[in-house]
């Protein structure tokens, strides 16, 4: 082969090799620098846009609180709102006569069935929060089922009041599980509210026993767990309020109690 032809072929081969090398380099650089769309780890939700107080738009797991600050002489009387509407009316009467606010964790199905009482609760200045749609044993449910219970009650609250409520309290458990905390946070509730005073009024021990059990543990920052569906509880409220007043403890709505740093049990 003539020298000139050998030189021509060598030059052509070198040019092609350089071109392939440059193209590969550009492809590698593109792969390493081009941003990719992240895949969401959970289904996107509208948490935070429905309900005036649904503020946890990041979907982080909720935190649990058992009591408010012990440095203030304030307590919160919280009621699980379900059952006989006549008993709920009696509770509202007692609270109105005493001039004290209460906080009610409503079962969503109950809200839908008793719109007139919901309006009275709001008119009387009480607080309404989320206590699931149908009051199941949440610890026995799957993640999607827990989420549905929380979100359906939130929707009922929003429909009835214009707000999804500030807080969530699970049904069927005294301490929320990690699953419940995760689903509550994803639904827009940064705090799950438990309690440090539980008279177990749902066992119907009688008004005297309920009052004695509450007052034995009542102290600054206490969150008391009670139920609207038990006659003894409604009757016990008046003596509980009397004892709180004697001790210089002021019943306030939950959001007022918890605007400081919450504490553990």
Locate each region found by the language model.
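Secondary-structure junction/capping motif
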Residues: 4, 25, 253-254
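Short, low-complexity, disordered segments immediately C-terminal to signal peptides
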Residues: 21-42
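C-terminal domain-boundary segment and adjacent tail
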Residues: 35-37, 42-44, 48-49, 57-71, ...
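Active-site beta->alpha N-cap acidic-glycine motif
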Residues: 48-141, 145-149, 156
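Catalytic domains of cell-wall/extracellular-matrix polysaccharide-remodeling enzymes
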Residues: 90, 136-265
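Short charge-dense sequence patches
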Residues: 39-44, 64-69, 96-109, 160-168, ...
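N-terminal secretory signal peptides and thylakoid transit peptides that target proteins
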Residues: 1-15, 19
């Amino acid at each position: 082969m003539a020298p000139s032809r050998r030189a021509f072929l060598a030059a052509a081969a070198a040019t092609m090799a350089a071109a392939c090398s440059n193209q590969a380099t550009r492809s590698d650089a593109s792969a390493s620098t081009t941003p990719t769309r992240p895949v969401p780890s959970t289904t996107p939700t509208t948490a935070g846009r429905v309900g005036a107080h649904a503020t946890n738009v990041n979907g982080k797991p909720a935190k649990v609180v058992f009591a408010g600050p012990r440095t203030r002489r304030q307590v919160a009387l919280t009621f699980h709102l379900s059952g006989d509407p006549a008993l709920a009316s009696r509770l509202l009467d007692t609270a109105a006569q005493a001039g004290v606010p209460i906080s009610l964790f409503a079962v969503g199905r109950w809200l839908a069935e008793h719109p007139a009482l919901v309006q009275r609760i709001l008119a009387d200045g009480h607080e309404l929060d989320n206590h699931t749609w149908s009051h199941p044993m949440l610890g026995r449910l799957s993640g999607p089922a827990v989420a549905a219970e929380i979100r359906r009650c939130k929707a009922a609250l929003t429909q009835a009041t214009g707000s999804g409520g500030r807080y969530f309290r699970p049904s069927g458990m005294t301490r929320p599980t990690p699953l419940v905390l995760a689903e509550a946070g994803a639904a827009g509730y940064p705090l799950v509210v438990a309690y440090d005073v539980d008279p177990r009024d749902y066992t119907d021990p009688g008004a005297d026993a309920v009052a004695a059990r509450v007052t034995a543990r009542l102290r600054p920052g206490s969150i008391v767990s009670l139920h609207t569906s038990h006659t003894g509880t409604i009757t016990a409220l008046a003596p509980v309020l009397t004892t709180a007043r004697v001790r210089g403890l002021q019943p306030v709505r939950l959001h007022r109690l918890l605007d400081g740093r919450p504490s553990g049990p």
